[in-house]
Amino acid sequence: MAHRFPALTSEQKKELSEIAQRIVANGKGILAADESVGTMGNRLQRIKVENTEENRRQFRELLFSVDNSISQSIGGVILFHETLYQKDSQGKLFRNILKEKGIVVGIKLDQGGAPLAGTNKETTIQGLDGLSERCAQYKKDGVDFGKWRAVLRISDQCPSSLAIQENANALARYASICQQNGLVPIVEPEVLPDGDHDLEHCQYVSEKVLAAVYKALNDHHVYLEGTLLKPNMLTAGHACTKKYTPEQVAMATVTALHRTVPAAVPSICFLSGGMSEEDATLNLNAIYRCPLPRPWKLSFSYGRALQASALAAWGGKAANKKATQEAFMKRAVANCQAAQGQYVHTGSSGAASTQSLFTASYTY
């Protein structure tokens, strides 16, 4: 027999709901700047910049110190632990710079994947041990939301029922712990684009994954109005020979979400999944314009698809500050427009914005 557990007070629920709504108000999205040291190193290597703490700090300072108008397009920023405690060149904490712009500060909380025994090289996510204590400390340090990424892949045998259930339950436990500590949980069940599967198969798998996630969230008494969902857009595998239009991607994506995601969820903040900057924007715009019911706000939580052009413009040189910040602002504004179905592709995008950002078995 089911029993009610008053896990959250009305005041806690109100705070969580208000934070979630503030992040995605008026087409705003999220900058995912939570890359680990290793992942950031891979990106710096591509522009021939050494992976040092100072170089990582310098690039992120360029992103966070843009004009205050960025707050019209970006409502939240996800930070890595290192970045949360870093300062700009004047000695001001990055998190305080963001807050002064009216941007909500978030933190990456998962600690990467671990092999899931009894499966074909599938994984579960680490980080639940000590999570409550970490959340409590982050809340004291000015953080208002968290992110937890679970990864599933498509192949002949994957994802297995075991992997789906294990990752769904880990996401739900994380979400419950976050809310107990005043953090809005971003729930991120990512189905990787690796493989040669078609769009229809991706939709089938994604519906199974999302249904399991929301069953688990319900089992763990998670307050849906105080959460955000960060799913992949539904696309064919990177090696699939058949190509699909943004409108086809949009129809499959919204259909799957409509079948599985409760209307109580405030917003769906899509990840870019290795698409080029321009494709991520075009697909988001098409999803908004899809002629199907959408009870949730549509938004974005992009990392590579907001930073690729900026990183290329920077090249590790302080003299490129203006070009770097302009490139970042351009993508932020474009995605804010797309989240409201107002983006118009002009065909004038730079080379960096049209380059695929796909990385096999991508990890943060």
Swiss-Prot record:
SUPFAM superfamilies: Aldolase. Its main location: cytoplasm. Beta-D-fructose 1,6-bisphosphate binds at residues 43, 272-274, 304. The modification N6-succinyllysine is found at residues 13, 121, 317. The record marks 364 as: Necessary for preference for fructose 1,6-bisphosphate over fructose 1-phosphate. It is an enzyme of class 4 (lyase). It comes from the Eukaryota. Coiled coil: none annotated. The keyword Lyase applies. GO terms for molecular function: ATPase binding; cytoskeletal protein binding; fructose binding; fructose-1-phosphate aldolase activity; fructose-bisphosphate aldolase activity; identical protein binding; molecular adaptor activity; phosphatidylcholine binding. Pathway: Carbohydrate degradation; glycolysis; D-glyceraldehyde 3-phosphate and glycerone phosphate from D-glucose: step 4/4; Carbohydrate biosynthesis; gluconeogenesis; Carbohydrate metabolism; fructose metabolism. Homotetramer. Interacts with BBS1, BBS2, BBS4 and BBS7. Forms a ternary complex with G6PD and TP53; this interaction is direct. Belongs to the class I fructose-bisphosphate aldolase family. This is Fructose-bisphosphate aldolase B. It comes from Rattus norvegicus. The gene is Aldob.
